[in-house]
Amino acid sequence: MARYRCCRSQSRSRCRPRRRRCRTRRRRCCRRRRRRVCCRRYTVVRCRRR
């Protein structure tokens, strides 16, 4: 499971806060199944790139 926090650019209420937060310049909110997690580089193994 992803362990990233919600992106500041996106709505925090929509994203579920995780333990760690994205440590990348480009932070985007990816939604995996029913949960939305923050993806580093907006492209993570867990999240699909758009």
From Swiss-Prot:
Hey, what tissues is this thing expressed in?
Testis.
**Domain of life of the source:** Eukaryota
Chief subcellular location? nucleus
Q: Name one GO biological process term.
A: sperm DNA condensation
| One GO location term (cellular component) | nucleus
What does the protein in this record do?
Protamines substitute for histones in the chromatin of sperm during the haploid phase of spermatogenesis. They compact sperm DNA into a highly condensed, stable and inactive complex.
Query: Family assignment?
Result: Belongs to the protamine P1 family.
* Name the record gives this protein: Sperm protamine P1
Q: Which organism is it from?
A: Natalus stramineus (Mexican funnel-eared bat)
Q: Which gene encodes it?
A: PRM1
